[in-house]
Amino acid sequence: MTESVVCTGAVSTVKEVWEERIKKHHEDVKREKEFQQKLVRIWEDRVSLTKLKEKVTREDGRIILRIEKEEWKTLPSSLLKLNQLQEWQLHRTGLLKIPEFIGRFQHLIVLDLSRNTISEIPRGIGLLTRLQELILSYNKIKTVPKELSNCASLEKLELAVNRDISDLPTELSKLLKLTHLDLSMNQFTTIPLAVLDMPALEWLDMGSNSLQQLPDTLDRMQSLHTLWLQRNEITCLPETIRNMKNLGTLVLSNNKLQDIPGCMEEMTSLRFVNFRDNPLRLEVTLPPSDDVDGEEEQELFGLQFMHAYIQESRRTEDQVNCLTHTPSSTRSDG
């Protein structure tokens, strides 16, 4: 019986030893695999960095990374070795996301990642205090982080054709140098408060959205000289539009406007307006022009049409008032 106990104990010990050896072997294999994977990543990063370096050029004194129509769904961390870059120009690369380490490129002046498949803007974007241009048109972005308001040098922001952006954080009104904003072809139903409060904004495109009404506070954009609102569902214009003294270009084609407010005659800075393809209640025909160029200008600019429409509207209104106030004769002869 004693021999049986000793034998059982020996077997148990041998089993434990073998289990320990097997466990150690598995761990060694795992470590070896991880080491090999690490070597592969290091090698791939080096290869990627070499490829990226080939895409770096100097133009007008700026260091630019330019990639066109070449697949780069992600950008490797080895790109950080090129942190002196001042411009990224990556178009049609299939890029899925802006890297989280973007904030470490403190020298960036222009970030142009248009025509990719980017779905979000990382909060680290706010660390780019020297950034002057951010161009993210033709992507799949749905929201804009409030941290973007920390890009104090930003002058140009393009978010066109992302199709699903419907609002902007109010913090973006802190972008005191922003002069150019393109929000066309998205899902905005009104002009965001942040936009109305951007003090330096000169150029705004909100065409091809779902705007139905323009806010009465539209005239807060006193620096605005160009406003594109084509292809929306706008039904009327606020009277306060007369106060936009610097507005020179106003495009309202393909909307649901039924009238042109008479106060627009006071907008002496207007040089280009377009009311084409609106269900206006009055039909106004301009007198023929003496030359072909003049006819093209009439049709394209619409400024003469606007003034003619307002005059016709007033004339029609005067006729209605006259008919309303004409006393009817109730006396009979004899």
From Swiss-Prot:
Function field: Component of the sarcomeric M-band which plays a role in myocyte response to biomechanical stress. May regulate expression of other M-band proteins via an SRF-dependent pathway. Important for normal contractile function in heart.
Signal peptide (residue range): none
Pfam families attached to this UniProt entry: LRR_14, LRR_8
Chief place of localization: cytoplasm
Species: Rattus norvegicus
BP GO annotations: intracellular signal transduction
LRR repeat boundaries on the chain: 59-82, 83-105, 106-128, 129-151, 153-175, 176-198, 199-221, 223-244, 245-269, 272-295
Cystine residue pairs: none
Quaternary context: Interacts with MYH7 (via C-terminus).
Keywords of this entry: Cytoplasm, Leucine-rich repeat, Muscle protein, Repeat
SUPFAM superfamilies in the record: L domain-like
Subcellular location: Cytoplasm, Myofibril, Sarcomere, M line
Official protein name in the record: Leucine-rich repeat-containing protein 39
SMART domains: LRR_TYP (SM00369)
Induction: In cardiomyocytes, down-regulated in response to biomechanical stress.
Superkingdom: Eukaryota
Gene3D superfamilies xref list: Ribonuclease Inhibitor
Organs and tissues of expression: Expressed in heart and skeletal muscle (at protein level). Also detected in kidney (at protein level). Not detected in other tissues tested (at protein level).
Example of a GO cellular component annotation carried by this entry: M band
